């Protein structure tokens, strides 16, 4: 549903409407007018992403507008465990498929920060997310093990976490207990996100087209990062020289509006 305004003698579609509330511009979600004593909707800006169920998928186009990539809602709000601060209070969206594949390094590694997996995620939004959405990505403080703490597995969290707009999920965030790592060698890098279940077994919630990386490294062993197999089961032996998939996660404000389109009886949700 669209409304138009006249500009230079031409009708131009209005994508968003704002009203002033307490001196602040607030975006209008829906607009109504009275017709024969009945309220008729003349504008629908969409529904806030917070109103959608976990597991719902959303399409976001790339900067060219020629491709649409799909993301699944896996958490709303700040995850539990006390390891996140208010920067995580948003809608967590996880790429539904593998976006790319890479190995990590030919040499011993000391963590996630600054290595191939992290660097790829840092550069991901610029080439894969349209600017109107990329500009709204939240910078989240992620629980992580600093390179200098590699041998002790001390987790930096809250305001001391790793600041990122795009990142890989940790194994813990996807439902793995730390003691399920090799000999317990997994740091507590976060808490389980609400969409996932506690299991190391195959699950559709983690299924993908191929094996893919997490941001969790085996404690005190720079040869391995934890990963998941294509069927969603836990892989504790992702060797740094092997090439595996990448499934980025982004976080948007909970009031982000979603446009829903019905096509042949099916609903598709888009973030513009």
Predicted regions and their residues:
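Collagenous Gly-X-Y triple-helix signature in extracellular proteins
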Residues: 43-272
